[in-house]
A protein has these predicted regions:
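Substrate-binding cleft and catalytic face of glycoside hydrolase catalytic domains
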Residues: 50-68, 76-196, 265-267
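Aromatic-rich peripheral "rim/lid" segments of glycoside hydrolase catalytic domains that contact
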Residues: 67, 137, 142-166, 179, ...
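Acidic-and-aromatic substrate-binding clefts and catalytic sites of carbohydrate-active enzymes
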Residues: 32-45, 63-76, 103, 143-146, ...
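Glycoside hydrolase catalytic-domain groove-lining segments
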Residues: 76, 81-86, 166-189, 199-269, ...
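Short, acidic/polar
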Residues: 36-50, 118-126, 200-211, 275-279
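C-terminal outer-membrane/trafficking sorting elements
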Residues: 373-385, 409, 709-759
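Boundary/entry segment of secreted carbohydrate-active catalytic domains
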Residues: 21-54, 58
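Extracytoplasmic
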Residues: 341-390, 397, 403-405, 409-709
């Protein structure tokens, strides 16, 4: 936030919209929402742009409205509103990316890992459609009330989808903001909720403070403000509203938006009187960046009596709002985000929110300016200046010398002399056990780490809700987590194989890392099967979602749902598979639902079921024309009809089917055969992704070999197709290919192709 936030000077700041009839204030807008999926309400009500200079879609940009049918995205309603705003020169807000209410109906039927994939896909499609956005309600209504009940019944499911509470209790929200910032770094990212000004004030403040303190890229807090005046619940007083606004701002020190203001009062005089109390207090607050009213047409709002126009005629409250917006107080009120633009992105990222007394805590100030240049950043702990930083990445260390809560403050000074501030907090615990690797030895990856060898330190710093002493005899608990300091020897793709045991289904875990610039999920959320007993361990393969960089990392093993046991984690480097060549089926880089089991003298994909899939990073070293490639799949099955589909995904996203492999009944899952076949698809050279989708389950897959012929030596046109035939180099007919050089003759689309094949 700019230090000179409350100054009245705004040289060069343009009015948001030349067409705005109510607000001419350059620091903040007075906006509204769509009416029954339309922008202009009709019915004698003035056109939208003649009243308001900001628009929010009431429903049109919510996930359920856009992707009601999975994979089909309907942006028509949102486009209509946003394009209207652009035509008339005012701003708009995307509402909302994450909400535990209006999500697609199909989402809840998916397992957690697939739900996260679906949510990531939702973010990606929103980014692809809207390259830039001025403002986003990233998360809507995630607070729990004073009774502990979530504001929306879908919140527990959404929380699980985004990785659970984790180290902070709000990691799922941090993850949502990181995902939004990754895609729209210049947007103003907002947390939005109701009852934040009356009944759930403290829980709301705690949530927003935690996001801010953890370094999440949250830029503002949004008060919906439905709780300020209602025939059902009464009216807030002027004194109470003043008090709670001050309480919020003192605690948060961030810009505030009033996001969904309405006064649901049937009596005209009482509605007007309540607007006269609340609107000036909200609008004139120097930390208020804008006010959005939640509907204005009687009969077309979510509650009965909040409309400001009834039968096309202004209610007295609307007449007063128009008069108030022309006063000097309304016109000259200052705000934190001139022109509704984010100049400074400043987030303080401590390595942890808790630290032992006497220990050293690394801290990064994530700082980026939109149009200005950073000269220096000063970081304070309380009133003590601990660092002045002039070059990115703006990382320093703090040695915790006394216990208690500490306030961090970053002051960013730009080359034009402007200053911007951001706060955070850390807790210094009274314990003096410093955080360090288990047995003071940092394991090098690739290697195996026993699950009980998590870092030494205090509870809440290096682990939570687990006991090293009872680790092998006590099932892991919901919300537990353990951190492991490791040293990755080389950049590259890795996988994690986890030995688990469980007497029930439903356990879940994932591996994450609290980096300075992101909360990274290194694995997808993995479900733990019922292995039969607490001592019967099964290996689960968890591909790492992104390549690891060489150097020191701190991995966090998050127990999303407990009730199971973990013995060890084995980290393996995955070599990039060169094709032609052999691909070991267990060496996948991504996948969903598959199991790795022992088989055929090693590891295999086992007990496959329909819908499972795996992907492999491959490098095609030899391009192939139509029919040049063939495959050999080492497989087993005890049933008829098992099959899997092979697809090659090129670097530009183009998908090419390589065909479907029908797995024969080999008599037993322990009896493996080699299934051969032709690939009638041209294959390009270069790095690509090979995907295997299980069409009909019941098979095991050990390996897949792709073979490219060394060259086509003759071709002649034929009128009828024949089966592939094998010949020796001297022309002798063979019943099957032999070791060494073979000639293969195959009729493809009426053309006989003879190829050299080396076995």
């Amino acid at each position: 936030m700019k230090k000179t936030l409350f100054a009245t000077l705004f040289l060069g700041v343009m009015a948001i919209s030349a067409n705005a009839q109510l607000s001419s204030n350059p620091y903040k807008f007075l906006g509204n929402i769509t009416t029954s999926y339309n922008v202009d309400a009709g019915g004698g009500v003035p056109q939208f742009y003649k009243l308001w200079n900001q628009i929010t879609c009431e429903n049109e940009s919510k996930w359920a409205s856009v992707e009601g049918n999975r994979g089909n995205f309907n942006w028509g309603g949102a486009d209509n509103a946003f394009n209207y705003a652009k035509r008339h020169g005012f701003t708009h807000k995307f509402h909302a990316l994450v909400w535990g209410s209006q999500y697609p109906n199909w989402l809840s039927s998916l397992p957690a890992g697939e739900r996260f994939t679906a949510m990531t896909n939702w973010f990606d499609h929103a980014k692809a459609h809207y390259e830039t956005l001025p403002m986003i309600d990233v998360v809507n209504e995630a607070v729990s009330n004073i009774q502990g009940n979530p504001h929306q019944p879908g919140n527990p499911m959404i929380k699980e989808t985004l990785g659970g509470g984790g180290k902070t209790g709000y990691d799922w929200l941090i993850k949502a903001f990181e995902m939004a910032y990754e895609r729209w770094p210049d947007a103003i990212l907002i947390y939005n909720d109701f009852n934040s000004l009356r009944w759930d004030v403290d829980n709301y403040i705690t949530l927003v403070q935690t996001l801010r303190d953890a370094g999440a890229p949250i830029d503002a807090y949004g008060n919906q403000s439905h709780d300020l005046g209602d025939d059902r619940y009464g009216k807030i007083s002027e004194a109470e509203l003043k008090s709670v606004l001050k309480k919020q701002q003192d605690a948060l020190q961030m810009p505030m938006f009033v996001t969904e203001l309405d006064i649901n009062i049937a009596n005209d005089a009482q509605q007007k009187a309540q607007y006269q109390i609340v609107l000036p207090l909200l609008w004139e607050a120097p930390y208020c960046a804008g006010v959005t009213l939640w509907g204005y047409v009687h009969g077309a709002t979510w509650v009965d009596n909040s409309g400001l126009y009834k039968n096309g005629v202004e209610r007295p409250a609307m007449t007063w709002i128009k008069e108030y917006m022309q006063t000097d107080a309304a016109k000259n009120a200052v705000g934190p985000l001139p022109g509704t633009k984010k100049e400074a992105s400043i987030y303080i990222r401590p390595a942890a929110l808790k630290v032992a007394s006497g220990d050293v805590l690394p801290i990064k100030v994530r700082a980026k300016m939109a149009t200005k240049t950073i000269d220096n950043i000063k970081l304070y702990v309380g009133s003590e200046l601990i660092a002045t930083m002039t070059e990115a990445p703006y990382i320093t260390e703090y040695t915790a010398s006394s216990t208690g809560q500490k306030t961090l403050k970053a002051v960013v000074t730009t080359t034009d002399g402007s200053t911007y501030e951001r706060l955070s907090r850390i807790q210094v615990l009274s314990g003096t056990t410093k955080r360090e690797p288990y047995n003071e030895t940092v394991p090098e990856l690739p290697s195996t780490i026993n699950a009980d060898e998590f870092d030494q330190g205090l509870s809440g710093i290096s682990y939570y809700n687990v006991s090293r002493q009872n680790f092998t005899t006590t099932a892991l608990k919901n919300g537990a987590w353990m951190e492991y300091t490791v040293d990755v020897k080389e950049d590259g793709l890795y996988s994690m194989e986890v030995e688990v045991a469980s007497m029930t289904d439903g356990g879940m875990f994932h591996l994450s890392e609290y980096g300075f610039d992101n909360l990274t999920f290194h694995t997808n959320i993995t479900q733990v099967p019922n292995t039969g007993s607490a001592t019967t361990f099964q290996t689960l393969r968890c591909p790492m979602t992104e390549p690891l960089t060489a150097g020191r990392h701190t991995f966090c093993l998050n127990i999303d749902k407990g009730g199971f046991y973990i013995k060890s984690m084995t980290f393996k480097a995955l070599p990039e598979v060169e094709l032609p060549g052999t691909l070991e089926a267990e060496d996948f880089t991504n996948g969903d639902g598959v199991n790795i089991i022992s088989g055929n003298g090693g590891l295999v994909l086992g007990n496959t079921t329909s819908g499972e899939w795996v992907e492999y990073a491959v490098n095609i070293t030899e391009p192939g024309k139509f029919g040049t490639y063939s495959y050999e799949a080492t497989v087993s099955s005890a049933v008829e009809g098992s099959s899997f589909k092979m697809t090659l995904i090129e670097s530009d996203g183009t998908e090419k089917s390589l065909g479907t492999v029908t797995v024969p009944n080999t008599g037993s899952l322990n009896t493996y055969q080699v299934k051969t076949g032709k690939i009638f698809t041209p294959i390009k050279k270069g790095k690509q992704t090979l995907r295997i989708n299980i069409v009909n389950g019941g098979c095991n897959i050990d390996k897949l070999k792709l073979i490219c012929a060394t060259g086509i030596i003759s071709a002649e046109t034929e009128q009828t197709a024949t089966e592939a035939q094998w010949f020796s180099p001297d022309g002798r007919r063979l019943s099957a290919p032999q070791k060494g050089l073979n000639l293969e003759r195959t009729v493809i689309n009426g053309q006989t192709v003879t190829r050299k094949v080396i076995r």
